[in-house]
């Protein structure tokens, strides 16, 4: 993929951290549908880093990554100054 593909600006974001999985999944799909219908190409999903979880590991991040893989969407961790491992940038072409 070209460098310009990854440098595209984030159009919108949703903060899912502090939600339970089922609630996060519903919110995620609603957000993705809306972003797609608005013609957005790159969005950010905030999952949190897991600092408030019992074992200090993110519960939502691997869950959301699994959904993204299932949906065959391109994604990566946000840049360090934009959320780092607590956020995922998603391309929805």
Can you say where each PLM-predicted feature lies in the sequence?
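Long, charged, low-complexity intrinsically disordered regions
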Residues: 1-93
């Amino acid at each position: 993929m070209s460098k310009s593909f990854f440098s595209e600006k984030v159009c919108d974001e949703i903060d899912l951290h502090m939600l339970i999985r089922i609630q996060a999944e519903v919110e995620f799909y609603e957000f993705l549908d809306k972003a797609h219908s608005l013609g957005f190409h790159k969005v950010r999903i905030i999952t949190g880093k897991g600092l408030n979880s019992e074992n200090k590991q993110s519960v939502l991040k691997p869950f959301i990554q699994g959904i993204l893989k299932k949906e065959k969407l391109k994604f990566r961790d946000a840049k360090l100054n934009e959320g780092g491992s607590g956020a995922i940038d998603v391309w929805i072409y």
